[in-house]
Every structure is written in C-alpha cells, then in structure tokens.
C-alpha cells in the first residue's frame, strides 16, 4: 500500500466518521452488491449463431473499433481482462445467441449443454450467470413480431425459445448456486399508425403465460419482463409497453426490468424504483445511458446513475434489486467500455453507501429542506475517492486510470492481431 493512498484513506475515515459514516462498513456492504456485466458489449451483439448476420430488433451498435471478439474463447478472454480491472463481485449476463455448438441449433431447441463451457468458466471465475432469450436478429422476427405474432406457428416458435431459455437459466442457477435472472425483451411493434393495438397485447399476454407455465425452482431461476417505449422501425407502437409489463409483473409476480434507455427522454428509472417495489417482488435494472434515444452509450458516473444507486441503498433493496448493465459502444475499445461502465456503477453504489442518509431523513421529516439540500451538496465534496481507491487496492485492481495501461497492452498484444 502506498503511503499516499494510506494517508488519504485515514483522512477519509476521519472525515466520514465526523458525519456518522463507517467507511469499513460501507465497503462491506459494497461487496454485497454484484453488478451483472453484459457479454454483448464485447462483440457488438453479434453472438455465435450467425456472427455475420445483421443486428435487428430496432437496436444498433455503432462504430467499427478494431479487435472485437469473434468467438467464445476470445470473448471470455476479453471478459477476463476487463474483470481483472473491476473491483468487487460481478456476474455475467448472456444472451441465447452466445450458445456454443459444432452444429446449427434452432433457437427453440437450445439446451443447457450448449452453454456448459460458460458454466465451467463461470465456476472457475467465481461468477453468477444471468440469461436472456434472443428474440431478434432471426428470420422469424424479420417482420417485427415474435411472442405477439399473429401467425400461430411463428408465435409458438418464440414461445418454445423462451421456454427453452428458462431451462438454460435454471441450469445456470443450479450449477452455480445463485439464481439466474432471465429477462424477456421482445422488439414487437409497428412503424406507423396502428389500428388494432389490443390483439397483439392479448396474444403477448397468453404467450407469456405459456412461457412461464413450467414451475422452476426460484433458488435457481427468476423471471423478469422488460418494457420499451419504441425502437427503430417500431416508432409508433410497442406491444410490450411500460403499462403492459407493469401490469404483467404485478399480476404474475415476476420481476420487472427497468432499462434506463427504454422510456421517454424526460423520464428516469430512479424515480420508478420505489413505485414498482410496492407491487412486484423483485426488480432487474438495466443501467445504461440514453443519448436522445435508447442509444446504449457507456454508463457514466452521472446524476441518474447516482440516483439509481442511491435508491437501492436508501431503501435497503439489496436483496430485491438485481443490477445489470446494458450498453454497447463499438466506437471505442470494448474492454475499456466494460471497465468504465462497470467501475462507474460501483462508484455510484459506494457513494450511496457513504451518504449520511439517517441524518438526511431526519431533516426531511422535520421539514428542514434548506439543511437537506445543503447537506446533500456538501457531502459530494467528502473524499469518497480515497475510499474507492482503498476498495480497488483491497481487491487487487488498479487505482485511478492505471487500468488503461493494461487495456492498451492487451490491445497491442491481442486485439490488434484479430484484424
């Protein structure tokens, strides 16, 4: 430990103790909050089913930075490199298109065996796994509909894909001893004025009920459903809207997924957490950064990321909220994107844990909003960075921007050879 870092740490302990915060306890609590990293940042959501195929479903990964992962071995190596630079507990979030098989596998035929390499890797790296059916980038999703499709056979194909995905998810949880959160997001919607908005939602309701009809052990698998405002090519109507999925999660008691980019630009999911928690058992968060639309930019340590973290900590939602990331930027080094976004999420959680929340609640209850605002602002200047650096040091990860040197070295030695 460097003398400078240790001195800063000792001073930070004193400063936070003066406002009633035990920094050692904050670090212990931070280790209770794993962040689920999304595999698809590493290859621009290409997957291994048809890596040369185009990305569909109203989403885009823009940019052509060299060195993207081309297969599972490269993707796992890249993830390991990123994870070495991120302190504290982590999980990995997989999509169905990241299966591994020597032969072509239809999506409604995926099985746990197609993900056994991921499970063995997760065991070796002490990671939990989360999962997602992939209802996009497929010939049977080309017309913009999947689980709400009017064609019975196509709709059944996607139902069977989601049912098969649930079994894969349960396999993850059973093998790794920690439940896998499986999130269902579909791109279903229409580009222009839609006359019948009801029928697709009726079909989606029935389809989802069939998907979750098989009883699985909640210690192994958790169902989540995710809404969206619009996507490219589905600007006028989205079947799985916020109201639809809020109603579904409430009535079926599934988890509800809130994605930071899936609402109107003036809406924030930090304000939705406390409302949704009154009605659903668990929440899944997709922390992202929408720039004018659901652009999935790399997560910053900005006001909304901080507000999301603060909601989790202030209301002690550690056991009811699952924190995941969802961004994919192909214009910068993809490993750096993972590191920047995940470290920022963890920084936000730490800052929330270092907040004098008890005192702030007292001021709010007393109607002293002047002192509340003053204290909220002044605590931003407390030396949280020194606490973060100690956390990095204890987890044998680089302090400050030192991690960038490792990324550059890996880029030169490994990524540059990929063409």
UniProtKB/Swiss-Prot annotation:
Q: What is this protein called?
A: L-rhamnose isomerase
GO cellular component terms attached to this protein's record: cytoplasm
- Whether Lyase counts among this entry's keywords is no
- For this UniProt record, give its keywords in alphabetical order, as a comma-separated list: Cytoplasm, Isomerase, Manganese, Metal-binding, Rhamnose metabolism
InterPro entries attached here? L-rhamnose_isomerase, Rhamnose_isomerase, Xyl_isomerase-like_sf
Query: How is the cofactor bound here?
Result: Binds 1 Mn(2+) ion per subunit.
Task: Give the pathway listed in the UniProt entry for this protein.
Answer: Carbohydrate degradation; L-rhamnose degradation; glycerone phosphate from L-rhamnose: step 1/3
Per the UniProt record, which EC number(s) apply here? 5.3.1.14
HAMAP family given in the database record: RhaA (MF_00541)
Q: Would you identify the family this protein belongs to, as annotated?
A: Belongs to the rhamnose isomerase family.
What is this enzyme's class at the first EC digit?
Answer: isomerase
